[in-house]
Curated annotation (Swiss-Prot):
Protein family according to the UniProt entry: Belongs to the YajQ family.
Stated name of the protein: Nucleotide-binding protein HCH_04620
SUPFAM superfamilies named in the record: YajQ-like (SSF89963)
Domain of life: Bacteria
Source species taxonomy: Bacteria, Pseudomonadati, Pseudomonadota, Gammaproteobacteria, Oceanospirillales
Any one of the GO CC terms: cytosol
Keywords, sorted A to Z: Nucleotide-binding
Species for this entry: Hahella chejuensis (strain KCTC 2396)
């Protein structure tokens, strides 16, 4: 029986390249001359540091641009937390990786509500979709891609006939 997996993974290499490119762009921009501002990437977050609040907004635009150029889904950036320390303002964005249980249940619910001839099962941090025909699986992929209420980056992999 044909099947595929729905996962939420981050391409770490492209994410690292995006953050490096954003740092290079910061050095080149005229409005950031003489300003201590930087992007740092850790295992679970992307951190921005600048001197003013409005500079963080500009930095977010730079980061979003570099992420989209590298074809990294912008939804990988989760909730932000702000900190003020001395003359610097820091904003940290958590990285979303893996499907949470609630999101996985929503995916299964949407598949079942659509009354397609496929079965969905949750397997850890991924959802496996199985069906009798390849066309049914492709229809399920189109349904999930078109759904705006699911606010997670999804990849469809491990497609088997």
């Amino acid at each position: 029986m044909p099947s595929f997996d729905i996962v939420s993974e981050i391409d770490r290499h492209e994410l690292t390249n995006s953050v490096d490119q954003a740092n290079r762009e910061l050095e080149m921009r005229y409005d950031f001359r003489g300003v201590e501002a930087s992007f740092t990437l850790s295992e679970k977050s992307v951190e921005m540091a600048a001197e003013q609040e409005f500079q963080l907004e500009q930095m977010l635009l730079i980061l979003n641009t570099t992420l989209s150029k590298r074809k990294v889904d912008l939804r990988v950036l989760g909730d932000s937390t702000d900190q003020k320390s001395g003359k610097q303002v820091k904003r940290s964005y958590a990285l979303k990786e893996g499907l949470e249980q609630k999101v996985a249940k929503d995916i299964v619910k949407k598949i079942k509500e659509s009354k397609m001839k496929v079965q969905a099962s949750i397997q850890g941090d991924q959802v496996r979709i199985t069906g009798k025909k390849r066309d049914d699986l492709q229809e399920a992929i189109q349904l999930l891609r078109g759904d705006e209420s699911l606010d997670v980056p999804m990849q469809f992999n491990n497609f088997r006939d």
